[in-house]
Design a protein with these regions (language model features):
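Transmembrane helical segments that form the transport core of multi-pass membrane transport proteins
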Residues: 59, 86, 111, 116, ...
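Membrane-interfacial helix-loop connectors
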Residues: 22, 68-77, 94, 144-189, ...
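Transmembrane alpha-helix boundary signature
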Residues: 18-22, 71-91, 100, 104-124, ...
Length: 474
């Protein structure tokens, strides 16, 4: 792939002739088609400027999605082909609905575990442990890598960053290095699990990669994390920060909710692997598990409070006695309400926008330039670099919508690059953007950019490891 290919890919959306189309009405060279492309570019520019405009990222893409499909509907109505446009819209909406419900259940479980103070307990243990800064650098990185395959990488990164900020005592250099490490580790950990990132979930749901096959990316993902981490750790001092003796008690049912989450994941995998039903069926069943467990917690709360009150009175524990008065009954629907609705609605807007542009035929044009006329390996590496500038969700959905004829190894490669490519820049992933806000002034875009050579080295090493270790899948 030549150096001009990225430029040609962008220009192709605007100037290439309509030699391909996914729908029977050719719109790629029409004024409607070009307007829709421009509208999507404008909407995504507003998304990228979210931090500066204080504009939720879901708003521009929701408007763009609605306008794009209305214009498609008008064009097809003029040709007397409204049912074709309706069917295409419903097909795209179904793809979104399956992913949205899946993510909603996962977010609900994460919120439930947060409510039961699991993450607070982990943070408190790390803070009071008395580790020196270099050990904490490695611990937060390893924990981010290990937690993100199960929880989403955004939650994982925020949790680990909270630990770093607690112990750093204003050490800007350590905070910057630790946050870079956390972002890389969280993104790398999410790249080899269907549950670790929205893009891996999309690939699994689309049937391009089976559940067990994702784990062939474990070593490449691990190298993506370790290479820059080793280089950055040399700059982290061995200073021991002042320990904090905070102790966090888990709320009732915390460990059982973790067990139910694992059972939910197993149910989803079994539904997909053995019954060939969408994984969302298993996830929604898992939400039912949590609903009934929440019912049990609410009904048994008075008995539990009575036992604890008697125990604390017997031990003379006034602090814990007072805390009983602030106990709030567990409410599953409250956890659903606290899901990342901005992310879910943003996901709707992106899926519908990309689906609409694909129906017009633009994705076939890009697919021709990217995969048919070029090397798929270089194309998939470029996808990862593109993910560092543009959110990997629309990039991966576009690739899945193009549906290029690729071997399993290539699908694993694009899954890897889209997942870890966002670590190249601080704005390339949700984890990076969130940590710039959480550690404002200490973890910055330019602070991250200084370590781009080390991060890029890890990116290239992970790709090389995949091409070598999984060569039989190409």
């Amino acid at each position: 792939m030549s150096a001009l290919t990225p430029v040609m890919l962008l220009l192709s959306l605007f100037i290439l002739p309509a030699h391909a189309s996914s729908g029977p009405v050719l719109l790629t060279s029409s004024s409607i088609g070009l307007f829709c492309v421009g509208l999507f570019v404008l909407a995504y520019a507003l998304v990228m400027a979210e931090e500066y405009l204080q504009l939720r990222k879901s708003k521009p893409v929701l408007v763009a999605a609605g306008v794009i499909w209305i214009l498609i509907g008008i064009a097809y109505a003029q040709q007397g082909m409204s049912p074709v446009a309706e069917q295409a819209f419903r097909h795209t909406l179904l793809e979104y609905a399956e992913l949205m419900l899946f993510l909603l259940v996962a977010m609900t479980y994460i919120n439930a575990m947060e409510d039961r103070r699991l993450f607070d307990a982990l943070r408190a243990w790390l803070v009071r442990s008395g580790f020196h800064l270099r050990t904490l650098f490695w611990l937060t990185g390893w924990l981010a890598f290990c937690i993100s395959p199960m929880a989403d990488n955004l939650t994982t990164a925020l949790l680990m960053c909270a630990v770093v900020l607690k112990v750093a005592d204003g050490d800007r250099r350590f905070v910057n290095l630790a946050c870079i490490n956390i972002v890389i580790a969280a993104n790398a950990g999410g790249a080899f699990s269907p549950f670790g990132d929205i893009t891996t979930l999309m690939v699994w749901q689309a049937g391009k990669v089976q559940f067990g096959q994702f784990f062939t990316l474990l070593i490449p993902s691990l190298l993506n994390f370790l290479v820059p981490a080793i280089l950055m750790s040399l700059m982290v001092p061995r200073h021991v920060p002042e320990a904090d003796n905070e102790v966090v008690d888990l709320k009732r049912g915390a460990r059982r909710i973790v067990a139910l989450f694992l059972l939910t994941i197993i149910t989803a995998v079994l539904c997909h692997s053995f019954l060939h039903l969408p994984p969302v069926l298993g996830m929604m069943l898992g939400l039912g598990y949590l609903q009934f467990f929440g019912f049990y917690l609410r009904k048994s709360l008075p008995r539990s409070l009575a036992r604890k009150r008697a125990l604390y009175e017997r031990n003379g524990d006034e602090v814990r006695l007072r805390s009983l008065g602030s106990v709030v009954p567990f409410d599953v629907f409250n956890k659903v309400a606290k899901a990342e609705w901005d992310t879910l609605l943003f996901f709707y807007g992106v899926v519908m926008c990309v689906g609409g542009l694909g129906f017009m035929g633009y994705l076939e044009l890009v697919s021709h330039w990217l995969y048919d006329a070029g090397d798929p390996t270089m194309a998939n590496i470029f996808i990862g670099v593109l993910s560092s500038v543009i959110d990997n969700i629309p990039v991966m959905f576009a690739v899945l919508s193009m549906n290029p004829d690729m071997a399993l190894g290539q699908w694993l490669l694009v899954t890897l690059t889209a997942g870890v490519g966002g670590s190249l820049l601080s704005i390339g992933s949700a984890a990076g953007v969130a940590l710039m806000g959480q550690a404002h002034g200490m973890y910055t875009f330019f602070g991250h950019l200084k370590w781009l050579p080390a991060i890029l080295l890890g990116y290239l090493v992970s790709i090389g490891a995949h091409l070598w270790l999984n060569s039989a899948q190409f």
